[in-house]
Amino acid sequence: MRKETPPPLVPPAAREWNLPPNAPACMERQLEAARYRSDGALLLGASSLSGRCWAGSLWLFKDPCAAPNEGFCSAGVQTEAGVADLTWVGERGILVASDSGAVELWELDENETLIVSKFCKYEHDDIVSTVSVLSSGTQAVSGSKDICIKVWDLAQQVVLNSYRAHAAQVTCVAASPHKDSVFLSCSEDNRILLWDTRRPKPASQIGCSAPGYLPTSLAWHPQQSEVFVFGDENGTVSLVDTKSTSCVLSSAVHSQCVTGLVFSPHSVPFLASLSEDCSLAVLDSSLSELFRSQAHRDFVRDATWSPLNHSLLTTVGWDHQVVHHIVPTEPLPAPGPASVTE
C-alpha cells in the first residue's frame, strides 16, 4: 500500500494570462465536479455555498495543470445557481445538475472559447443532485431532492419519463455503460434500484445496502456489465453482482461518508473512492487499498482519470484545490539493498 502523496503537477512558468470572453472574473470556492474529455481537456464545475447567493460556474482548461487559475482557462461561464453535478455529452456538450432545480445543457462553440446555453429546464421541484448520460448519448437521467427521477431526450429537450419510486431524496444515478436503457439510483430511503426503461415496471430493488447506513454513491464496472460498486454514509465501499443482488465484496475504506466512486479506464480498472473524511483512496479489484492521499483540507467532491496518462488521477474539493495524483499502475518493487551513486 502506498500512502505518500506526490506533489501536485507544477504548471509551466511561461504562460500568458488570457481570460476568455464571457468567462467570470472569479471562480467560486467550492469545486463540485471534474471531468476529463477524451483529448485531455479538464472541465470543472464550481459553487459558492456561502453568502446570500448560491452562484456557480463552468470552466474548461485545455491545460489541466493550470486549473483552477481563472486566467488560464480556455472557456468559462456563470451559471444561475450552484453546480451539483455535470458530465460531458459527446465532445462539446455539458449536462449540468443545478441547485436551482434545473437540468441544463451547455455547449462549447467551434473555437471552444465560449460556453453557450442550449436549454435550461425546470422540471424538478428541488435541487437536482445528480445527472448521468445513457450509453446511447442521446438520453440522460437526472435525480433530485424532490424524490423524482427523470429520463430526458437531449435532442428534443423534453422529459420522456418521470418516476417516483424512491421515498426520499435521490442522491445518485449512474447510467450503465453497457446497456442504453439501464441505470442505477440510490436514495436516502436506504434503497438501491436497478432500472430498465424497456420494462413495464422499470425499477427493481437491489437488496444489498447495510441497514441503517444510507447509500450515497454508485459506479458501474467498466467491463463487467452486471457488476457495480456503491459507497455509503459510513465510509464503506461494496461490490455488487446484479444477477445475485448480493454484495460480493465489502471494505471499510473511509471514516466518513463516501462522496464519489470512479473507475479508471485501465484494462484492469482501479477504483477511486472519495470521502468527507477529506481523503482519496484508490482500490484494486479486491477492494484492497493501493494508494491514499490526504492532500485535500475539506470534503473531496469528485475525481476523474486522465484519458492520456493512465497513472494520472485528478481530484477536486471544497478547499478549492485541483490535485493531480500519480497512482502506481504496476506493483511496487520489493525493497532491495541500498545502492550508492557516485
Curated annotation (Swiss-Prot):
WD repeats lie at residues 22-75, 78-116, 123-162, 165-205, 209-250, 253-293, 295-330. One of its GO terms (molecular function) is methyl-CpG binding. The keyword Repeat applies. Its main location: nucleus. SUPFAM superfamilies: WD40 repeat-like. Keywords: Cytoplasm, Nucleus, Phosphoprotein, Repeat, WD repeat. The modification Phosphothreonine is found at T5. PROSITE patterns: WD_REPEATS_1 (PS00678), WD_REPEATS_2 (PS50082), WD_REPEATS_REGION (PS50294). It is found in: Nucleus; Cytoplasm. It holds the Pfam family WD40. One of its GO terms (cellular component) is cytosol. Gene3D superfamilies: YVTN repeat-like/Quinoprotein amine dehydrogenase (2.130.10.10). One of its GO terms (biological process) is oocyte axis specification. InterPro entries: Methylosome_Comp_WDR77, WD40/YVTN_repeat-like_dom_sf, WD40_repeat_CS, WD40_repeat_dom_sf, WD40_rpt. Non-catalytic component of the methylosome complex, composed of PRMT5, WDR77 and CLNS1A, which modifies specific arginines to dimethylarginines in several spliceosomal Sm proteins and histones. This modification targets Sm proteins to the survival of motor neurons (SMN) complex for assembly into small nuclear ribonucleoprotein core particles. Might play a role in transcription regulation. Component of the methylosome complex composed of PRMT5, WDR77 and CLNS1A. Found in a complex composed of PRMT5, WDR77 and RIOK1. RIOK1 and CLNS1A bound directly to PRMT5 at the same binding site, in a mutually exclusive manner, which allows the recruitment of distinct methylation substrates, such as nucleolin/NCL and Sm proteins, respectively. Found in a complex with the component of the methylosome, PRMT5, CLNS1A, WDR77, PRMT1 and ERH. Directly interacts with PRMT5, as well as with several Sm proteins, including SNRPB and SNRPD2 and, more weakly, SNRPD3 and SNRPE. This is Methylosome protein WDR77. It comes from Pongo abelii.
